[in-house]
């Protein structure tokens, strides 16, 4: 077992009850284009077209054959684009349940499928896009092979669902998914889980089970990769979400695209935080109707640390998100707030009284408690960075745009979510995730 000592479990109120309930009926779903790093779409449908679930909506121009398929049947009600015609979302108004049938196999023959058969099947169904590379967090290029594949069967994000509760409902499909993923690599398939969780029921020479314990980010796949299979420009691994492993298992045994999603709906502004069964790309406004406290709320697809805020074109459950978080918009001004003791304010340093209440949960809002200022190295970053990385030096080089030094200090191992805690504890209020993405893009372009 690998024990993580550095990190932070955010003391936020509104943790969900780990019981799965049926979510509300969803009438609109969407595929969000900006979730796929570097993707350039070639549209195969137009607004007003009627599509089946599993039908291709667009193809990646940079990687021919990588199809992005509809998560539901119905009418394409909107294709939203942003600046420079960047694809933001393809919205589908759900109508019926017609779907594209896919080939399926006997359970006993799954471990005999070739790499080419598996890739072809995943590409046609759109489930290939559930895979992401490290470094760069991009959809893998067809016909490539990773050194290893990672599945994170644990989640230490604030307000997260317990993956064990979800995997237990589809354990057979999860095991079938592991069999399929093992066909894509000659290396290991690493299943990372918390201590005491019974996910190690499937025996395969390539599948290994690894226990991680400790505070967040002990559950992030970037942490697992760092300790088990560190990556570089010459070494690539893939990772995939545990619910997508279930979907892959069902695709190959049933021949249909499984688009169910069990998500945590939680946060200080949720009336009854719980796990909801919904569908991939579900409308967040429909998902949260009647479940929020009154007030000016911010709905977030994903974690409060690294998720995507609700907007007109992005108001849908993200492809890689397992939770919906809701916090209050912090628009109020506080007179002389800087001299108040701060009993209801949390800080990782001893600057507020709330720091000393070790078991108190806080109703966090979007208030940043100050504006941008100089980056001050007072040890905050090192407290929450468990990786073998010089955090302050790396963050400084990211802000300076020094690609060579940032790469030497380990930025290739990171994704935006790996620096979310550094953003949270930063006295200078810097957003390190977007800066990291810019540096990674430059490194990739420069080769």
From Swiss-Prot:
Family: Belongs to the NqrA family.
Catalytic reaction equation(s): a ubiquinone + n Na(+)(in) + NADH + H(+) = a ubiquinol + n Na(+)(out) + NAD(+)
Subunit relationships: Composed of six subunits; NqrA, NqrB, NqrC, NqrD, NqrE and NqrF.
GO MF assignments: oxidoreductase activity, acting on NAD(P)H, quinone or similar compound as acceptor
Gene for this chain: nqrA
Short name of one Pfam family: NQRA_N
Record's function text: NQR complex catalyzes the reduction of ubiquinone-1 to ubiquinol by two successive reactions, coupled with the transport of Na(+) ions from the cytoplasm to the periplasm. NqrA to NqrE are probably involved in the second step, the conversion of ubisemiquinone to ubiquinol.
The entry's keywords: Ion transport, NAD, Sodium, Sodium transport, Translocase, Transport, Ubiquinone
GO-annotated biological processes: sodium ion transport
InterPro entries (UniProt xref): NqrA, NQRA_2nd, NqrA_C_domain, NQRA_N
Protein name: Na(+)-translocating NADH-quinone reductase subunit A
Disulfide bonds: none
EC number(s) reported in the record: 7.2.1.1
């Amino acid at each position: 077992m690998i024990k993580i000592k550095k990190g932070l479990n955010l003391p936020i109120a509104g943790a969900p009850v780990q019981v799965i309930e049926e979510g509300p009926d969803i009438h609109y779903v969407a595929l969000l284009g900006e979730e796929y790093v570097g993707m350039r779409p070639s549209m195969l449908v137009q607004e007003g077209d009627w599509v089946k679930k599993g039908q291709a909506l667009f193809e990646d121009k940079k990687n021919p054959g990588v199809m992005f398929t509809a998560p539901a049947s119905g009418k394409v009600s909107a294709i939203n684009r942003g600046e420079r015609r960047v694809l933001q979302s393809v919205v589908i108004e759900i109508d019926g349940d017609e779907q594209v049938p896919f080939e399926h196999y006997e359970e006993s023959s799954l471990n005999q499928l070739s790499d080419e058969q598996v890739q072809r099947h995943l590409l046609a169904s759109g489930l290939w896009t559930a895979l992401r590379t490290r470094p760069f967090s991009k959809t893998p290029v067809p016909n490539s092979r990773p050194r290893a594949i990672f599945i994170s069967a644990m989640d230490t994000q604030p307000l997260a669902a317990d993956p064990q509760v979800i995997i237990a409902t589809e354990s057979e499909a999860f095991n079938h998914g592991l069999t399929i993923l093992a066909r894509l690599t000659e290396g290991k398939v690493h299943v990372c889980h918390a201590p005491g969780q019974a996910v190690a029921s499937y025996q395969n020479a390539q599948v290994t089970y690894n226990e991680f314990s400790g505070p967040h980010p002990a559950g992030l796949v970037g942490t697992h990769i760092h300790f088990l299979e560190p990556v570089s420009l010459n070494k690539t691994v893939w990772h995939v979400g545990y619910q997508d492993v279930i979907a892959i298992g069902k695709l190959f045994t049933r021949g249909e695209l499984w688009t169910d999603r069990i998500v945590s709906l939680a946060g200080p502004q949720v009336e009854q935080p719980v796990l909801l069964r919904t569908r991939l790309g579900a409308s967040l406004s429909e998902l949260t109707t009647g479940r929020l406290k009154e007030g000016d709320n911010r709905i977030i697809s994903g974690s409060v640390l690294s998720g995507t805020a609700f907007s007109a074109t992005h108001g849908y459950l993200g492809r890689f998100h397992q939770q919906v978080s809701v916090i209050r918009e912090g628009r109020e001004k506080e007179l002389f707030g800087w001299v108040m003791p701060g009993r209801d304010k949390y800080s990782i340093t001893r600057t507020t009284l709330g720091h000393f209440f070790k078991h108190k949960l806080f109703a966090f809002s979007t208030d940043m408690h100050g504006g941008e200022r100089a980056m001050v190295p007072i040890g905050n970053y090192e407290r929450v960075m468990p990786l073998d990385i010089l955090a302050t030096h790396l963050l400084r080089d990211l802000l300076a745009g020094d690609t060579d030094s940032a790469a030497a200090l380990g930025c290739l191992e990171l994704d935006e979510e790996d620096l979310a805690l550094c953003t949270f504890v930063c006295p200078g209020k810097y957003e390190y995730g977007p800066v990291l993405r810019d540096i990674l893009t430059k490194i990739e372009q420069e080769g």
